[in-house]
Structure formats: C-alpha cells, structure tokens
C-alpha cells in the first residue's frame, strides 16, 4: 500500500473483442491485490458478462467488481460521454474510499477507441497476434497514443503466420518512445513488465529507503 494517501489511480484498459482485456484485468488484480487496494469496473454493451467472468476467476471479491451496461457503442461510454463510467467510479470509491487503483475495462471496440482523460489517468491498449501481423501498423489512437501497448497471445504467432519481430518493429515506428510489451497473458509472460509500468507511471511504487 502507498504510505501517503493519494487519489485512486484510474487505469483504463481497452482493445478489440477477444484481445485479452479481461484476462489482463484478472492477472493484474491477482498480481497486485496483496500490495494495493483494488477495485474494477467492466463495460459490456448489453450484459455484465465480463463482470461475471472476472468474479468467477477470483480476481477480487465480488463486491469490488462492478459491471456497467453501456447500451450502445462501447467507445462512447469511455470517451464522448463517459458519465456512466464516471458515476461508476464515484460509487466504487464511495464504497471503498481507501482504494489505490480503479481498473476500468472498456467494451471491445475498434482501433479508434480512446479513454477520456477525465476517466483514466493511464491507458493500456491490448491487441493480439491472432488479429494479424498488420495490426500495429494500422495505427489508430489505441495503438499510437495509449500509455502502454500490449501485444498479446505471442504463442499463437507460428499458427497464424505472424512475425513477432515485424510486429515489434511496427509498434516502435507507430509509437515512437511510448512503451509496448509482448505478452502471453495466459502464461503470465510479460505480466511483470505491465505491473512495473503501472507502479512506476502511476506513482504507486514505494520510494526507496533513505
């Protein structure tokens, strides 16, 4: 836990359907819950399926996970009109005022989806190798402007004819100095780097002694 109470860090997680957003949330919660006070908000259009899956995984106690039904285009609820998610954040922080981190998972969307700065302090965008080697060079705000890009499911590269070297090279070209991580989240490969990024960029890590 942070020794000095700061406002909860809000981490937005976006990406296309099936890229691994819910898996990332599960792994992050399990990796960080012993050190930090965590809550999570999931977005789906017509159901609360991601909330159910995250709860069943045991990532956090059920009361610390809230599902939001956006009822429309997923990116609208995190960007143009984020009021439904801002209200969800307020409700969770009223329930858990000592929370260190609020994870906000968007509904699956296209490469143009981004989080409103009012809603998210840090943004993580997840794509997956199965979507094709060309995905990083297609660009879009999620790929070029997110604070951290995750290229997930690296284990599938041989099966879909994708070159991880090409994907990494294209990610560097599209993102400049912005970081990215190659991951196989099912096996937790690359997870430590994501946790370190959140701790360092979100100023969660305890300062060094002395």
Swiss-Prot record:
Gene3D superfamilies xrefs: P-loop containing nucleotide triphosphate hydrolases (3.40.50.300)
Coiled coil feature spans: none
GO biological process: urea catabolic process
Listed CDD domains: UreG
GO CC field: cytoplasm
GO molecular function: GTP binding; GTPase activity; nickel cation binding
Subcellular location: Cytoplasm
Pfam family, one: cobW
Residues binding GTP, per UniProt: 15-22
Entry superkingdom: Bacteria
Xref: InterPro entries: CobW/HypB/UreG_nucleotide-bd, P-loop_NTPase, UreG
UniProt KW keywords: Chaperone, Cytoplasm, GTP-binding, Nickel insertion, Nucleotide-binding
Subunit structure as annotated in this protein's UniProt entry: Homodimer. UreD, UreF and UreG form a complex that acts as a GTP-hydrolysis-dependent molecular chaperone, activating the urease apoprotein by helping to assemble the nickel containing metallocenter of UreC. The UreE protein probably delivers the nickel.
Function of the molecule: Facilitates the functional incorporation of the urease nickel metallocenter. This process requires GTP hydrolysis, probably effectuated by UreG.
Family statement: Belongs to the SIMIBI class G3E GTPase family. UreG subfamily.
Designated name of the protein: Urease accessory protein UreG
Species for this entry: Ralstonia nicotianae (strain ATCC BAA-1114 / GMI1000)
Gene: ureG
